[in-house]
Amino acid sequence: MKALKSLLLIGIISCFAIGLSAQTSGMISYTEVTKLEFKAIEGLNLGDMMPSDMSANKALYFDQHTSVYRDADDHVNEDIEMESDDGSFQMVFSTGGSSEEILYNDLKARKSLYQTGFMGKEFLIESDLEKATWKITDERIKYLGYVCQKAVYTKTIPPTPGSDESPIEREVVAWFTPEIPLPIGPDEYGQLPGAVLLVSVDEGKTEIKATAVDFDSDITERLVVPTKGQKVSPDEYEQIMAEKMKELEENFNNKEGSSSFIIRGE
């Protein structure tokens, strides 16, 4: 009888271990929606052709030590076109391009590698995986069948290099589930005691929502370190961005005849 009880106990523990293991690798699908705001530019006719928001389908692939956040297989690129009143200036902002946005997090080494592109040039931004100062509350909801807990923190966005602007603060609200016991989440939002399924930034100006959780897919080939682009630090990338945007502004202000630009927001 004792032997039978021992076998039953071993069987229960084994099943529990298998179930727990199954919760530490898989894929979470998300939708991202960002409300768009444009500063008025004299002579540039934004009119009704500008969308009120931009959306994207994303996927988070993960195991116990790694997470990769990138475009979902069904993601469709969007282009935004702007034209001056006299037709002498045209600009196209493209969400697609030669370099896909990929955020690779090494959870064990606490390192991050972000592959992105701007104006046709590719970059690999290397940084430490910094832990946000989350405040975990007692508030709970059920989402996609998971019990989720609310966490909040204030995100500080530094000013553009060389500008007189002040830092901008944005409140971030996240809902994470301890039922998926990994510090993962969409985009930069993670480092909580469970996977983040919902994110709201700046009172809903950006919203990220999980649409499905899949523990059955083989995600081995997705957990690959991105390699495209020039390796830069976050500060170096911000400096490059500032210089390129200044160049665009000068070209627009000093334009002669017809000018056009294509900006790839990869």
What is the meaning of each model-derived region?
Residues 1-28:
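Bacterial Sec-dependent N-terminal signal peptides
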Residues 23-266:
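Extended soluble regions of mature proteins
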